[in-house]
């Protein structure tokens, strides 16, 4: 017998009431959720709501990613915090979840997203490409651990 092939599907949903997430949880077996936020205080309200909902519905939370954590100046490599000091770390610590990545607001990434080209394919050695590759590898490991935990 051949090993069963695992398929991964990523569903991106905007913050809101949580109705979409609840519907998906009721209809699909969700292996894990990744909470993605920005450093803005208003976004953290949705993060907390999402964390509580996934905990209540027993959907494993793989971690938190902070998007647009800082602006990465292409000429100097200097980091600028566009949204001020982030409180994402405080929320992650309070609810006992790990921040898996702090992704920058990077001009090359934005340009390639607009063109529909993955930066990881175009410039795999770019700092941001490496961050996405590491995040993807980390998520796959966490998903495998969740699957192992659920089979025992």
Model region roles, listed by residue range:
Residues 10, 76, 140:
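Short, thiol/selenol-centered motifs that function as redox-active sites or metal-ligating centers
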Residues 14-112:
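Conserved catalytic-core segment of NTP-binding enzymes
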Residues 77, 149-152:
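Short, charged juxtamembrane terminal tails flanking transmembrane helices
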Residues 115-126:
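C-terminal boundary of histidine-terminating zinc-finger modules
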Residues 125-137:
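Short, amphipathic alpha-helical "lid/cap" segments that border enzyme active or binding sites
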Residues 136-150:
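Short, hydrophobic alpha-helical segments
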């Amino acid at each position: 017998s051949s090993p069963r092939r695992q398929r991964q599907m990523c569903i991106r949903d905007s913050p809101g009431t949580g109705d979409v997430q609840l519907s998906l949880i009721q209809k699909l077996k969700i292996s894990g959720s990744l909470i993605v936020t920005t450093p803005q205080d208003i976004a953290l309200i949705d993060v907390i709501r999402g964390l509580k909902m996934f905990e209540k519905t027993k959907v494993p939370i793989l971690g938190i990613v902070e998007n647009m954590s800082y602006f990465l100046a292409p000429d100097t490599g200097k980091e600028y915090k566009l949204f001020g000091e982030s409180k994402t770390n405080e929320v992650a610590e309070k609810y006992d979840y790990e921040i898996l990545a702090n992704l920058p607001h990077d001009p090359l990434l934005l340009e390639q997203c607009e063109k529909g080209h993955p930066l990881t394919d175009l410039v795999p050695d770019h700092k941001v490409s490496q961050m996405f590759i590491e995040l993807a590898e980390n998520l796959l490991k966490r998903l495998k651990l969740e699957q192992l935990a659920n089979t025992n």
